[in-house]
């Protein structure tokens, strides 16, 4: 993932192209971001300013050579402090019709499973949802007796305690996105 979305169009495309030139011979794909993703805390002020322009997205993919593209369609990173997401599905459809690389949905956490499912139906092929998974993991940690009793829990043990929460939430997203059976995690009913 090469996030240069805060830079100008030209500089973003140029830097992503540099990464692509380094990574391609090694068989490494390059994901780029075009159109910034707001943070939940400034979502209402920044949402419209950050939206990806579909025509510019096509040009960006052509200039940068990226293998997949994260676009801004009204989502945010992290938890929303005000009003929740207002996803622009028509914008996503326009982008999907114009670009020929897989699309990525950053800020999946707290964007709503219905919104994510619709984005996947339209053509999004990757959804990032780290904050949501972290929260489920932390919930496991905070409810663990060893943590509650003040025991010294190192990073390794904390990770082991948090893993079931991560896994549970990732599996929820896999079901919503239609990814079950297309990955290494086995879901048991």
Regions found by a protein language model. Give the residues of each.
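Thr-Gly-centered strand-to-loop micro-motif
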Residues: 105-107
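A hydrophobic, small-residue-rich beta->alpha segment in the mid-to-C-terminal subdomain
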Residues: 123-156
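Extended, intrinsically disordered, low-complexity segments
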Residues: 144-189
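Alpha/beta enzyme core
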Residues: 2-101, 113-124, 129, 142-143, ...
């Amino acid at each position: 993932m090469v996030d240069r979305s805060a830079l100008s169009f030209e500089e973003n495309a140029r830097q992503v192209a540099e990464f692509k030139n380094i990574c391609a011979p090694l068989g490494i794909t390059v994901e780029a971001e075009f159109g910034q993703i707001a943070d939940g805390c400034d979502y209402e002020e920044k949402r419209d300013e950050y939206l990806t322009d579909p025509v510019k997205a096509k040009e960006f993919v052509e200039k940068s050579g990226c293998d997949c593209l994260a676009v801004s369609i009204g989502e945010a990173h992290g938890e929303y402090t005000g009003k929740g997401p207002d996803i622009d599905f028509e914008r996503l459809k326009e982008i999907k019709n114009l670009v020929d690389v897989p699309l990525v949905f950053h800020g999946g956490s707290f964007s709503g499973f219905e919104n994510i499912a619709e984005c996947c139906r339209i053509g999004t092929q990757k959804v990032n949802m780290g904050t949501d998974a972290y929260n489920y993991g932390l919930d496991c940690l905070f409810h663990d007796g060893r943590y509650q009793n003040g025991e010294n829990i190192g990073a390794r043990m904390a990770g082991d305690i948090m893993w079931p929460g991560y896994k549970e939430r990732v599996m929820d997203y896999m079901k919503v996105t239609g990814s079950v059976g297309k990955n290494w995690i086995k879901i048991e009913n």
